[in-house]
Amino acid sequence: MINEIKKDAKERMTKSVESLAHNFGRIRTGQAHPSILEGVMVPYYGADTPIKQVANITVKDARTLQVVAFERNMLGAVDKAIGSAGLNLNPTNLGELLLISMPALTEETRRGFTKQARDVAEDARVAVRNIRRDANSSLKDLVKEKEISEDEERRAAGEIDDLTKKFVAEIDAKLAEKEKDLMAV
């Protein structure tokens, strides 16, 4: 019972950290990276479709993305979708492909992205702490049902606390790395 609760908590905390990394990937650092366009939806036969399903996105160089639509006639729609996605990106249409130059980040935008990164990290910390609370609640329920002793509950709660501290430290390390990337000129 206790091991199942700890295993479940660890898996959920790992997913929270993976989600953090995914969300950090969407925050622009001035470097070209395909994940920047992940949230872009392209109208395709009447339905909004993720850009990855209608185009191939590659990194041409450190500050340029190259987008090639799977269907040539979709290039205009992809161009329009990227331009109107609110990412402050202006694609250059070369007929067969789009080139997207990453604009240099101003000090103000860097600070805004840093604040956004901190908010995302705080959400991940809260998620990890909520998982700890759920696990501790499950342990208390087991004590009430007399399935485990109070000593076992305290020991398991301590292990879950240690696990929580480890994952929060990992979140803090990822945040520090992202802030460093954002503030690098």
UniProtKB/Swiss-Prot annotation:
PANTHER family: MITOCHONDRIAL RIBOSOME RECYCLING FACTOR PSEUDO 1, RIBOSOME RECYCLING FACTOR. This is Ribosome-recycling factor. It comes from the Bacteria. InterPro entries: Ribosome_recyc_fac, Ribosome_recyc_fac_dom, RRF_sf. NCBIfam families: frr. It comes from Pseudomonas fluorescens (strain Pf0-1). It is found in: Cytoplasm. Responsible for the release of ribosomes from messenger RNA at the termination of protein biosynthesis. May increase the efficiency of translation by recycling ribosomes from one round of translation to another. Keywords: Cytoplasm, Protein biosynthesis. GO terms for molecular function: ribosomal large subunit binding.
